[in-house]
């Protein structure tokens, strides 16, 4: 008990440091961003509650349903206590790692678990069955209830998690001292906001053990650096490849390690690969919009690619929002008679945002006005804001396990390159991000043919070059039906391919791993589910399928090219300095 008392005192001391770290920026006048978010959430949940509470009969029915569930849990607990076998009223998903500890099957903790599951299932059903809500409000309410349900799980609290109780008793509370220390450090790192560590950030460094493919930065603007990768084959395909990654994350997800690198694999296939590395913008770039990213990003890169290789045309690859910008750029080029792009590959790219997934819950006029107000004050959207939004999409994987591990078990997270990249967030210029949210998520103007860029109306039907469009089956950011509908807007031949897994793992899937699968089928157009029903499944990675499609376009080869050619003196080694800039 003496050791426990000493550790309790240490925990209180570390807790004081955590409170001080949280309060410091607020005492200095930093606005609390949570106020607007909480008000919006309460308004949304209030609309659901109003439906059930406005009619006494409905209200009684809802309460009775919940009470019946609790009575079933109570009856089952009594059966267990008397030594009888009881069938659970509510079962956790077999894949749910929160309740894997055997102690969750004991009468007390099983009743606690089932009470939680009954309550969360009931709350979700209240939203699902509420009538008279517009689709966006219902979608947002479902998302918010899911977030709340995930947050209040008994596995997230010391006194209701049997594993944490054992850990605390066996270590005399040392886990809580370490956990409070971790909490204070993360609040300091987040400058008063909680920046949950998902991995050991000291284990990785871009350019040291990540983003290692050899190459040179041959050209740069204030928005991007252009990297040309060194060849690994004596000859290469005549027409070069330009990759346009997202600026919401950093490009090295495509070059994490040599074993996982799509960039290295393409180079080894005999391609001359160029990649745009976007700048991590600050307030000086606040007014840079979508058209600037087109001109000083893609167009400037195409000019440099032509000078470096002598080739007028290039094949392009766009990933996520980089693909959306590329699609808009291709429509602009089609309208202005610019033929510098020979083909395009879209990786988990949305052009039509009708079914854009859970990210849509963050975008309506009220929320967007708040975001734009914050961006106007700073000149950009903080990288942490987007990182938090992405983590909330999978909070049971990317938030709460780390809360338990870091702050209640007092452990350090394991080194994991993917999660290092996930935490290496970037800022977004105010003008660019506002255009993207309004024209894509809020108004869907690109798909409707109402969007303009640099004074030109965008018509995706004018894009007639060959296209390879990849979606991933479990994508929560760019859902496959959304990518499918967008691909159907294009005016040329489209090979639509569906890969297994999600937004990252489905794309970065080296063939040597023999993981997942992909599906191929007929042309786009019509219903996605009909396409999927008729699609053929193939084992393994989609990369070889893409290589076969790509090779048929321009099979001619030339001697391998060194980065920059005779036109450019390399500025620095890949991956360059832009990608190293922290948010």
Swiss-Prot record:
Its main location: cytoplasm. The active site is at 320. It comes from Azorhizobium caulinodans (strain ATCC 43989 / DSM 5975 / JCM 20966 / LMG 6465 / NBRC 14845 / NCIMB 13405 / ORS 571). Gene3D superfamilies: alpha/beta hydrolase (3.40.50.1820). It catalyses: (3R)-3-hydroxybutanoyl-CoA + [(3R)-hydroxybutanoate](n) = [(3R)-hydroxybutanoate](n+1) + CoA. The gene is phaC. GO terms for biological process: poly-hydroxybutyrate biosynthetic process. This is Poly(3-hydroxyalkanoate) polymerase subunit PhaC. Belongs to the PHA/PHB synthase family. Type I PhaC subfamily. Keywords: Acyltransferase, Cytoplasm, PHB biosynthesis, Transferase. The lineage of its organism: Bacteria, Pseudomonadati, Pseudomonadota, Alphaproteobacteria, Hyphomicrobiales.
């Amino acid at each position: 008990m003496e050791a426990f008392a000493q550790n309790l005192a240490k925990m209180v001391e570390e807790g004081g440091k955590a409170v001080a770290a949280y309060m410091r920026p607020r005492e200095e006048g930093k606005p609390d961003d949570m106020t607007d978010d909480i008000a919006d959430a309460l308004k949304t949940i209030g609309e659901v509650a109003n439906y059930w509470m406005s009619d006494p009969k409905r209200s009684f029915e809802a309460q009775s349903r919940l009470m019946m569930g609790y009575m079933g849990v109570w009856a089952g607990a009594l059966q267990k206590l008397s030594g009888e076998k009881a069938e659970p009223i509510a079962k956790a998903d077999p894949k749910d790692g929160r309740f894997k500890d055997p102690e969750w099957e004991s009468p007390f903790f099983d009743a606690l678990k089932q009470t939680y599951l009954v309550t969360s299932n009931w709350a979700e059903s209240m939203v699902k069955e509420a009538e008279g809500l517009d689709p966006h409000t219902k979608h947002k309410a479902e998302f918010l209830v899911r977030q709340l349900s995930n947050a209040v799980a008994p596995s997230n609290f010391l006194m209701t998690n049997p594993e944490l109780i054992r850990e605390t008793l066996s270590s005399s509370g040392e886990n809580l001292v370490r956990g409070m220390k971790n909490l204070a450090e993360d609040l300091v790192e987040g400058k008063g906001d909680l920046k949950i560590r998902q991995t050991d950030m000291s284990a990785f460094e871009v350019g040291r053990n990540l983003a290692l493919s050899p190459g040179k930065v041959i050209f740069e603007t204030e928005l991007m650096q252009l990297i040309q990768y060194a060849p690994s084959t004596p000859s290469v395909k005549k027409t070069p490849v330009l990759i346009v990654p997202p600026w919401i994350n950093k490009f090295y997800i495509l070059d994490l390690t040599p074993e996982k690198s799509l960039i290295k694999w393409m180079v080894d296939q005999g391609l001359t690969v160029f990649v745009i590395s976007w700048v991590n913008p600050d307030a000086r770039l606040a007014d840079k919009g979508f058209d600037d990213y087109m001109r000083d990003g893609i167009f400037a890169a195409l000019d440099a690619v032509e000078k470096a290789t002598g080739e007028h045309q290039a094949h392009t690859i766009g990933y996520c929002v980089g693909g959306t910008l590329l699609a808009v750029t291709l429509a602009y080029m089609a309208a202005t008679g610019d033929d510098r792009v020979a083909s395009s590959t879209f990786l988990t790219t949305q052009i039509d945002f009708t079914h854009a997934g859970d990210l849509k819950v963050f975008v309506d006029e009220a929320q967007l006005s708040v975001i734009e107000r914050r961006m106007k004050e700073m000149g950009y959207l903080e990288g942490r804001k987007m990182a938090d939004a992405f983590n909330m999409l999978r909070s049971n994987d990317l938030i709460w396990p780390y809360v338990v591990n870091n702050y209640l078990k007092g452990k350090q997270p394991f080194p994991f390159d993917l999660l290092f990249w996930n935490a290496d967030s970037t800022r977004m210029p105010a003008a660019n991000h506002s255009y993207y949210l309004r024209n894509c998520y809020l108004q869907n103007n690109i798909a409707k043919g109402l969007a303009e860029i640099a004074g030109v109306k965008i018509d995706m039907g004018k894009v007639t070059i060959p296209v390879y469009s990849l979606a991933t089956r479990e994508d929560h950011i760019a859902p496959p039906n959304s990518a499918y509908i967008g691909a159907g807007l294009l005016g040329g031949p489209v090979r639509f391919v569906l890969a297994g897994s999600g937004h990252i793992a489905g794309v970065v899937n080296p063939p040597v791993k023999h993981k997942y699968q992909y599906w191929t089928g007929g042309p786009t157009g019509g219903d996605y589910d009909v396409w999927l029903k008729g699609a053929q499944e193939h084992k393994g990675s989609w990369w070889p399928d893409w290589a076969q499609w790509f090779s048929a376009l321009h099979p001619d080869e030339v001697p391998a090219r060194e980065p920059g050619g005779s036109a450019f003196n390399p500025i620095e080694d890949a991956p360059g300095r832009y990608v190293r800039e922290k948010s």
